[in-house]
Each structure stands twice: as structure tokens, then as C-alpha cells.
Curated annotation (Swiss-Prot):
One of its GO terms (cellular component) is membrane. It comes from the Eukaryota. GO terms for biological process: nervous system development. This is Small integral membrane protein 3. It holds the Pfam family Smim3. The chain crosses the membrane at residues 20-40. Keywords: Membrane, Transmembrane, Transmembrane helix. The record marks 19-20 as: Cleavage. It comes from Rattus norvegicus. GO terms for molecular function: identical protein binding. The gene is Smim3. The keyword Transmembrane applies. It is found in: Membrane.
Length: 60
């Protein structure tokens, strides 16, 4: 009797634990975090090499 009383839309669509907007926000946050983890060490190395490069400091 339960299958008859439910609408076909409820039967076809799966129940999500989170809403769609929450899933999209989690994916975007993951992309931002992974991008910053990938780029920040490289940026730190570039800044360090620019500051300690002997030609830029005037030392021969």
C-alpha cells in the first residue's frame, strides 16, 4: 500500500543527504583549497628566490 500512496516523482528521485547547493559549495571550497595548496608553496619559493638572488642584490 505504501508504494501506491507515494507519488511517482518521490519514487524516481533519490533522497540526498545534503541539498544540491550544499554539494556545490563543498565542491567549490575543495577546488579553492586545493588550488591554494598547489600555488602557495610555489609562490613562496619564487618570492624567496627573488629576494635572495645575488644579481638583484648587487653582489657579484
Amino acid at each position: 500500500m505504501d508504494a501506491i500512496s507515494q507519488s511517482p516523482v518521490d519514487v524516481l528521485l533519490p533522497k540526498h543527504i545534503l541539498d544540491i547547493w550544499a554539494i556545490v559549495l563543498i565542491i567549490l571550497a575543495t577546488v579553492v583549497i586545493m588550488t591554494s595548496l598547489f600555488l602557495c608553496p610555489a609562490t613562496a619559493v619564487i618570492i624567496y628566490r627573488m629576494r635572495t638572488h645575488p644579481v638583484l642584490n648587487g653582489a657579484v
